Regions:
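Short, surface-exposed secondary-structure edge patches
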Residues: 4, 27-31
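Short, basic/aromatic beta-hairpin or loop at an interaction surface
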Residues: 6-19
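C-terminal structural segments of small proteins and small subunits
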Residues: 10, 44-74
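Short, acidic/hydrophobic/Gly-rich beta-strand patch recurrent on exposed beta strands
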Residues: 15-16, 31, 51-54
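Short alpha-helix capping/helix-loop boundary micro-motifs
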Residues: 22-26
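Conserved beta-strand/loop element in small beta-rich adapter and peptidoglycan-binding domains
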Residues: 33-40
């Protein structure tokens, strides 16, 4: 399992679990649910934030938030 912050642009992955943290509920409300497929669409010029497609939506996450999401490759 890898962290979402380690995944390359365009590589589809599946959310597996979250690091226990206060951001857990915020991520769930945004559509980051275990079993959901995600793709990193873009990375800002300085590497932070990243743009992600999840549940048909395009969202931005900071790298420290993405590092709390564990994913697996199909």
């Amino acid at each position: 399992m890898k962290r979402l912050s380690e995944i390359a642009i365009g590589q589809p992955v599946t959310i597996e679990k979250f690091e226990e943290d206060e951001i857990f509920l915020k991520l769930m409300e945004m559509g980051f649910i275990p079993g959901e497929k995600v793709i990193i669409e873009q990375v800002a010029p300085l590497g932070d934030p990243i743009s992600i497609e999840v549940a048909g939506y395009r969202l931005s996450l900071r790298l420290n938030e993405a590092s709390k999401i564990f994913v697996s490759e199909p």
